[in-house]
């Protein structure tokens, strides 16, 4: 795939032991609370809405059950690398898959990609964004709670100097399913948005957009 692999990268205060362990030492608790699958149709929805011209390698660093990857594949034939700290059974011979990979560790093998597209665990959203902005050469697209835009730490560590270029706020609510289990209706539905950092521009302005989910189009 022509991907340059190294063990470099500078995560400053987040390096050394890996950010997963730094933010939450209890893997079982984190796994139980933080894996919520992204609706595949909403991945296609945002890519079609943005009309993102993807030219290069895409990295999905927390692929879970492959819901995000499947949406990307419906939009583009660009090469995809997908990884996760846990093997949830997702398989696809058309992409590069790497399980048992801690995205926030200094040992993570994929340190350069053109795009990062992800829905990170919310408790780790800050270090995931920081790492993604280091890795991505062209852009970072993230699905996450609207709550990401608030908070002193996130403002200080990310939003002040690296605000997203565009934010698409859902007009209606989108359901994400715990542990990827679509047979269990979520107890509550969060307010979500898509965030895009355009690495090809130096602008620090953020454009705000509104987005209907696929079910209301």
Please give the residue ranges for each predicted region.
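Class I S-adenosyl-L-methionine-dependent methyltransferase catalytic core
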Residues: 2-217
């Amino acid at each position: 795939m022509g991907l340059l692999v190294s063990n470099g990268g500078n995560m400053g205060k987040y390096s050394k032991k890996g950010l997963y362990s730094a933010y939450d030492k209890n893997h079982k608790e984190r796994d139980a609370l933080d894996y919520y699958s992204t609706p595949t149709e909403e991945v296609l929805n945002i890519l079609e809405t943005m009309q993102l011209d993807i030219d290069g390698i895409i990295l999905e660093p927390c692929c879970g059950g492959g819901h995000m990857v499947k949406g990307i594949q419906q939009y583009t034939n660009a090469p995809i690398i997908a990884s996760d700290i846990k093997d949830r059974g997702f398989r696809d011979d058309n992409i590069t898959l790497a399980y048992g990979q801690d995205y926030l560790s200094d040992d993570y093998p994929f340190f350069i990609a053109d795009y990062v597209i992800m829905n990170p665990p919310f408790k780790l959203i800050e270090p995931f964004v920081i790492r993604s902005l280091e890795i991505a050469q062209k852009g970072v697209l993230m699905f996450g709670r609207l709550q990401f835009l608030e908070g002193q730490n996130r403002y200080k560590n990310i939003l002040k100097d690296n605000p997203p270029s565009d934010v698409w706020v859902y007009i209606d609510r989108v359901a994400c399913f715990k542990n990827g289990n679509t047979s269990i209706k979520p107890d509550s539905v969060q307010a979500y948005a898509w965030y895009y950092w355009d690495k090809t521009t130096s602008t620090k302005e953020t454009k705000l957009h509104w987005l209907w989910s696929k079910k209301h189009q």
